[in-house]
Amino acid sequence: RIESLPELVFSSKTIHSFKKHLQTFSPTALVVKDDLIALRLIQWLNNQGIKIPKDYSIISINNSSFAEIMHPFLTTYDINIQELGKESVRKLVAILKNEETEPKKVTIPFHLIERESVTSI
């Protein structure tokens, strides 16, 4: 298990402090919440002379079509978006029909797609 530090969790609102922390903390890997954001991050890092995965490993979530068109190809979690959508619609229909009112835990399987944006350390 890899621990993260709350002060190293960034959003689009805190991107400027991300840039500062990147130089201060020198991480080996970055976890990004979406493939499109990862694409933009990789482009920005490349413009700074930073190479992926040589300098930083990057992993993302979603396994969108962007993951296979960027360079390097993006290592990403496939979160099974179709099944997630189907389950959401089932739940919504059940609520609208008053068939289900109690919260219910639903687990949608996901898996890691290993490509080129991560290296061993």
Indicate residue ranges for each PLM-predicted region.
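Bacterial carbohydrate/catabolite-sensing allosteric modules
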Residues: 1-121
